Swiss-Prot record:
Name under which the protein is recorded: Dephospho-CoA kinase
Sequence positions that bind ATP: 12-17
Origin species: Pectobacterium atrosepticum (strain SCRI 1043 / ATCC BAA-672)
Gene of this entry: coaE
EC identifiers of the protein: 2.7.1.24
GO cellular-component term (any): cytoplasm
Top-rank taxon: Bacteria
Length: 208
């Protein structure tokens, strides 16, 4: 089985930027957010179920999912959020495992924004946390998403805390520094993960 490194971090921490740096070095990326979008594409059973549950108000004019409208519907309703999670999480897990099985590179970088919140730590051999302070998170989120400060703070309030993420980390990337510093951190971790993956493969071969 391919060695799995889970990459996580709060909103605005720069997970995609870090993943892009790993991809430049030849690392295979499996992104939970991309898979989550794929399972609700038009024509997929999950989107039909969502439409039946919430009505046409959560669809765009072209029939695709209006993610913003859906977020508004479930944000203040734990029951509806749980229903949606029960629908989507098994589908996301199934597709994730299918992608894992199809990959033959030494290790996979599995990008999972809600790794800690969903208790998925045990599904990876290594956990990498992208870390920035709260002020930086808010500044980046406001600049990127065009939302209000209150909306950004509401998102942070329902995510794992910085301390909770760091407590799960095997490795930490400080993404508050310059791009060159980030590239250097990624290159060092990439070499380390190749070594860990090789060691894990050797142990598995000896046990067969």
């Amino acid at each position: 089985m391919t060695y799995i490194v889970a990459l996580t971090g709060g909103i605005g921490s720069g997970k995609s930027t870090v993943a892009d740096e790993f991809a430049k070095l030849g690392t295979t990326i499996v992104d939970a957010d991309i898979i989550a979008r794929q399972v609700v594409e038009p024509g997929k059973p999950a989107l039909d179920a969502i439409r039946l549950r919430f009505g046409d108000a959560v669809l765009n004019a072209d029939g695709s999912l209006n993610r913003s409208a859906l977020r508004q519907r479930i944000f203040s309703s734990p029951e509806e959020k749980q229903w949606l999670n029960n629908l989507l999480h098994p589908l996301i897990h199934q597709e994730t495992q299918a992608q894992f099985r199809a990959i033959s590179t030494p290790y996979i970088l599995w990008v999972v924004p809600l790794l800690v919140e969903n208790g998925l730590q045990q599904r990876a051999q290594r956990i990498l946390v992208v870390d920035v302070d709260r002020k930086t998170q808010l500044e980046r989120t406001l600049a990127r998403d065009g939302i209000s400060l209150q909306q950004a703070e509401n998102i942070l309030a329902v995510q794992a805390t910085r301390e909770q993420r760091l407590a799960c980390a095997d490795d930490i990337i400080d993404n508050s520094r310059c791009p060159n510093a980030l590239a250097q951190q990624v290159a060092e971790l990439h070499r380390h993960y190749l070594e860990l993956a090789a060691s894990a493969a050797d142990r598995m071969a000896k046990n067969e």
